[in-house]
From Swiss-Prot:
Subunit structure as annotated in this protein's UniProt entry: The cytochrome bc1 complex contains 11 subunits: 3 respiratory subunits (MT-CYB, CYC1 and UQCRFS1), 2 core proteins (UQCRC1 and UQCRC2) and 6 low-molecular weight proteins (UQCRH/QCR6, UQCRB/QCR7, UQCRQ/QCR8, UQCR10/QCR9, UQCR11/QCR10 and a cleavage product of UQCRFS1). This cytochrome bc1 complex then forms a dimer.
Predominant subcellular localization, coarse grouping: mitochondrion
TM spans (from-to): 33-53, 77-98, 113-133, 178-198, 226-246, 288-308, 320-340, 347-367
Record-given protein name: Cytochrome b
Protein residues bound to heme b b566: 97, 196
Phylogenetic lineage: Eukaryota, Metazoa, Chordata, Craniata, Vertebrata
Family: Belongs to the cytochrome b family.
Membrane topology: Multi-pass membrane protein
Name of encoding gene: MT-CYB
Amino acid sequence: MTNIRKTHPLMKIINHSFIDLPTPSNISSWWNFGSLLGICLVLQILTGLFLAMHYTSDTTTAFSSVTHICRDVNYGWFIRYLHANGASMFFICLYIHVGRGIYYGSFTSMETWNVGIILLFTVMATAFMGYVLPWGQMSFWGATVITNLLSAIPYIGTTLVEWIWGGFSVDKPTLTRFFAFHFILPFIIVALVMVHLLFLHETGSNNPTGLNSNADKIPFHPYYTTKDILGVLLLILFLISLVLFAPDLLGDPDNYTPANPLITPPHIKPEWYFLFAYAILRSIPNKLGGVLALITSILTLTLLPYLYTSKLRSLMFRPLTQLCYWMLVSDIMILTWIGAQPVEYPFITIGQVASILYFTIIIILMPMSTMLEDKMLNWN
């Protein structure tokens, strides 16, 4: 008798995706982060669902309802901090996942890469709207500042902002629609993840060498399921430690003050995972220029398949481009630090230099080093 997982229409899909999937035998732990992102997504949807049962999306009661969750609901504080810090874990895994994709040349699988970029934008939008929901000071002012950026769009900007706000300022209609979008977007993300996996399984996984691995594949289960469990345990250990010992480490103290349109916080800043993009936005004195730089900072990922045309897919054997890559990683860390600093000397200058360097490395230095390496290997 044939195994049911190989014959049943539904089980067959799961079998081909997670059990009998032919996987390169040499993929390293950097390939763990895809499954970790799946775990994070499930965790966020579950904790979010329980939070939504007690949350009210009304400006007068939103802040109180979050306080009520933490004080009166059984393990409400735990669910709330799991959700808040789970978002941080999500972005850590997401950035490592994208970084691995750049390092090992995964962007040559164009469809998978482009769906991944759409996923990145969707997750960022979801996280931004989630940050507005507790209706603290930073929630309110963050929403005001970021949505206001759309007013830089010529002709339709102001109308667009008022349409998103549902009035002439961030108020009850804004909070209600942000809650609605924050609830529905994770399910759209799940659908996009399925498309992402569909395209990935069309071509098969990349591997650290960047070479074709068709001659050396092993089944995903039990080898990589076991390997992924280690990553999952480490992720859970780190997340639970954060939730139980330092739940507010990555948050902003200003968000423990109820939203007040009459008092502006001294430093308006988003969550830590958006700080690098926020630093690029702030480093340009012009509003429209800043918005364009902000969007371009992530959209440059779509250019990678066209910019890096080396004969070698992976950076494993390319020391010059490796140097540029780690310069880029360092630069993003500097931008993250700058985004959290006040707008004053020397932070403005450091931010501007780091922003110029960010685009220079991606658009000029890395493609040039790629061409130079090909030249040195007499491949061009």
